[in-house]
Structure formats: structure tokens, C-alpha cells
Amino acid sequence: MVRGIDIFKDFFKGFENSYVIIGGTACEIHEENYAQTPRATKDIDIILIVEALSNEFVGRFWEFVKSADYMQRDKATNEGMQYRHEYYRFMKPSDTTYPYQVELFSRNLGLLNFPEDAHITPIPTSEELSSLSAILMDDNYYNFTIAHSTIEDGVHIANIESLICLKCKAFIDMTLRKEKGEQEDSKHISKHKKDVFRLASMLAPADKFVLPDSLKDDIEKF
């Protein structure tokens, strides 16, 4: 289990509908539930549910950051006309019982109004935005992920089927960028591909899901 997930769960009890955990942590929880050996992951990737976000959640999250005493605090903002989003990354807690890294992604600007003394460092969005978070700027992927999520053992995580869609898309996008000569880590590309098959093995033969056309097309490309 990801280090600090129990602390995270206790801290955000009552706020489960304000966020969804995606990425490796969500995969790990599903793998443990299906008696698979989870691959190691040290970060918690979170998307904020804009429609359910409250000032109370923002205040609670800041308390979490202060309690952990994260030494590295980064923020990236994209104010372009097509995609507007904010991305936060908190790393290296002084209290090592907390998660090593927590990443927050919001499709709207200005939702997380941390205090002026938060000491958050601006970073280039294009450099640091995670592959899964970037995909969630797409309405179809965002809405499908939110709709196909559940509260599991006190934390809100993406379901198996939505993780498969996200991982397929990440694999496709990263592979295309690498073919164009852009710098992409082959290990990360391979990781997404392997995750798809690990997750698919957890689906029952009777499981059927209706996908938006764009997601269906990406699954077929994969």
C-alpha cells in the first residue's frame, strides 16, 4: 500500500466526493483487492471534482500540507483559451509517515486559494503536467472518470474501466510524442501498457461499458 494512504484517508474523511484518486495509487488499491502483487508507487495523483469542491476541502488540504511539512511545493497554471487548468505538486514531507508525493489537478483556475505564506514555487506547465492529468482536460475523459469512480475503503478512486481508458490514452499519446522525436521515458510508456493488461485481467467476462466515441476510438487504437 502507498505510504501514508491511511493518513490521507483519515484526513479527508467526509470530503470523499471532492476528489478522485487516479494513477498508480488507484491501480494498487484494485490490485490488492484482486490479490495481485501491486507495483511500487510513491505518489498520490488526485483530480478535483470541480462541481463538488468547497472552501472547507481547500482548507483541509492546506492543513494536510502543513501537517506533513512538505519541503517542495510546486504550482503550474495554464491560462490558454482552449485548456485552463492548475496543477500542484507537494513532495518530500518532513514527517515521513505522510505520502512522499501528492499531485493535484484542477480543470478550473483559482479553486485552490492557498494562503500567501504557502511558499509554492511556479513551474512550467508543459514540463511538469502528468500524462494522466493532461488527458483529463478532455471533457469526455473527465466526465467518464468521475462517473466511473467509487469510494473504496474510505478513499475515492477511479474504477478499473476508467483507469484502463486513461492508461490506453496515455500510452498512445506518449508513443506518438516519442515517434516525433520528443523526449519521453520508454519505461513510463511500457508501464502504462502493462497496467492496461493488469487492470483488464480484473474485469469479469460479463462486464460491459458504454464509452464515448473518442474513448472507444482510443481503445481500438491501443
Task: Please name every model-derived segment.
Residues 1-222:
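Compositionally biased terminal segments of proteins
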